[in-house]
UniProtKB/Swiss-Prot annotation:
Residues 82-141, 420-646 are annotated as: Disordered. Residues 292-401 form the PH domain. The lineage of its organism: Eukaryota, Metazoa, Chordata, Craniata, Vertebrata. It comes from Danio rerio. The keyword Iron does not apply. Appears to function in the signal transduction from Ras activation to actin cytoskeletal remodeling. This is Amyloid beta A4 precursor protein-binding family B member 1-interacting protein.
Amino acid sequence: MDDIDAMFSDMLQEMDLLTQSLDAEVDSAPLAKPPTIPEPQEMNFSIGFANFNESLNDLEDNDLDALMADLVADISATEEKFATERDTSKGSVPVAPAPSKPQSNFSLPASFDSSKPATSSNSIAAPPPPPAFKPSKEEEEEQLKADKIKLALEKLKEAKVKKLVVKVEITDGSSKTLMVDERQTVRDVMDNLFEKTHCDCNVDWSVCETNPDLQTERAFEDHENLVEPLSTWTRDTENKVLFQEKKHKYEVFKNPQIFYLWKKDKKSLKDMKEKDKEQLLEENFCGASVIVPDLEGVLYLKEDGKKSWKQRYFLLRASGLYYSPKGKTKASRDLVCLVQFDNVNVYYCKEYRIKYKAPTDHCFMLKHPQIQKESQYIKFMCCDDEWSMNLWVTGIRVAKYGKQLYDNYKAAVRKASGSASWANRTIQASSTASTPSPTPKAKAANGHAPQPPVENKVPSNQSSLPPPPPSMDFLPPPPPDPMFPPPPPAPPAPPAPPVPVSSTKVNKFPPPPKFPQSSFPPPPMDDLPPPPPPPEIADLPPDFLPPPPPSFVSHGGESLPPPPPDPVASLPPPPPAFTSAGGAPPPPPPPPPPPAPAPAVNNPAGSVRKVAPPPPKRTTPQLAAPSGGDFMSELMNAMQKKRTQP
């Protein structure tokens, strides 16, 4: 506030200096204003400034940032305005002296045509004006002084405008602080609140004032200047400004039949068509004068200075509210004017049944806006129900404001329709752009994720499964089953007694290492190299067949026929054994072994197939090597028994 005071004080001092420095020879046009205007302007400024300070002191929560922003905006706008005017004045001044010198030359073209000669005169007169005005520094200084005076006067006018910092409370408990000047209407303030609160702009929104002393509430009309009624509040007032929805604000235009056809049945009024409503509005609001609802009925009137209420028969007229002291007579000579609507407003009252012992809680009052406390000039009325109270209050508003009320309603409808259309466009754009994409992607991902893993797992299992089935077929015959489980490193090794379990799991382990050779007997052979007793290992001709070897290994007993071969000496030199193994197949008769293991048993001694390659590759089964010696001896004994048997 100190900065603002200093700014305006400097401005006034500058004006004083400028007015003193002006000479009497200056043109009367710019100098005529300063002598007559400065004194009243200074007084007006001081009054407006005092009101401004009072408004800041009255309100506790004032938004100084918004206040300074508005002041700076107003000052900058006026400065820009006068800067542009100064530029235009400078541009237009040189044209004036040019025609003064060659008057005879330029008089004719000017008379012929206004547009063409203007361009020619400007082009020809451009050179002469500079010398005429360049030397006239005094005139330029005078012009600058005049511009400064105009700018100062404009700023004074802006400062003279009453401005109030208003705290508006909203229904959700929040509040907004606004700076309002006397030129703004309630409609302008509501538009500002719509932008700040982002609420829907329906026609029911209202700016209301509440008076806790009188327990009253009134919705400001959209065309009213908000500063005017607020400036009547006292310094210590507890009045509040609210921003809330009031359904009865424009109910007369939504359902005019309720107010103009109130004597008819209420049920029939609700079913009126829209065309009939529009016609009713045209008849009452679009004519030369507005027709006020013809309301009449019994109301309770509070006596002055007492808490007693008397029934009176009231009639509503365009000029005011009348009642009949003699029953229900309607003769004009018998009517008494209770109040005229020119200088009063209508207010809703709250809890008057407790405060003034009213017959009901549906009360309203008529009073001057400057009356802020109880007074004998306030007229209190009480109705039987809420419907009749809204009927009378709305009728009084129509009688007071006339067509202006209808114009306010149409402006509110335009504002609401515009905001609604814009909101619908934004909602449609956002919904169409965002909704379709996520669902199909999620479904596709969920659908494909489970399928590929299942397919991958199935083929892998199938590749490992082919060897097991033959092993399952040969599992029952092997007698040395208890000894065979230890060799496989699989977890099923501990359960030695269950032959089927061990065989199935053993089959799973051998297949992976045997893939390179496709012969399963080598795994037992891997165990055979470490033990010295296996002399029959050379007899592995039956291992040449891929299917039987896995079965033999699983059974243990049938796999023994191939290892028993006598050439044990071939084990130390495994490399040469590879070559010999390749040539060994022809001498023995291996073809019969695929169908049955018997032929393979008959020819093991004759065919010495050194399957040394598998042992080096088979490193995992080394853990079972120590037990492999005894196992192989038992296998050899079993094979010998089988050989002896015809």
